Amino acid sequence: PACTSGGEPAARARPAAAPACGNGVYTWSDVDRRSVLTGVAEKQTLGEGGGALTHEVRPLRTPRVAVDFDRGPRIDAKAVLRSLGARTGDVGADGDATGFTDVHRPAPDPRTGGTEMEGAGTFVTYSWVEQVVADFQYTCGSGERSTGRATSWVVDGSGVLECSVPVEGAKEGDPALAAARFSCGPHAPAAAPGEGRPVRRASS
């Protein structure tokens, strides 16, 4: 066996997995785009005249930019994400300007800056991202296939809701409803879908 300079046997290198062909075709399925809750603060009650919201948003979910392979030869993750971005319109002809294909992209900080409320109420601050997830199949001319799932996110933001007021236009799956159920309680008016007051929401 080969030895290192110190006389110790060198570890045998494991053969790398064979890469997939470079001119294959992607087929995408189950493409899902939705806003997901990434952090929420404990509810905070303010008296008449309002005041500053000081409860810190606690992380619940860390957004990912990643490719998980199920079977077949591995493909460059950035190439997979570039194909997904082209499919969803998040990567244009001029390239990736948002970090959609960057597997080293840092997750957004769920903590928000100080927010001042003008009136009384019980408030909850929360953060969210718009996430894109899809399954793919990559097929080479020889018929060899690779399959897996790609995940990325395109925008992040934050919002403030009032527990006793339904969120305007809220639907099942909305981050505002998830935040209300988490911090206000499942029976709070803000936790139910329906018409109500607009949520205070700011995208970054």
Q: Can you name each region flagged by the protein language model?
A:
Residues 6-61, 99-204:
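Core pore-forming/fusogenic effector modules of secreted, proteolytically activated toxins
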Residues 54-108:
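Membrane-inserting effector segments that mediate pore formation, membrane fusion
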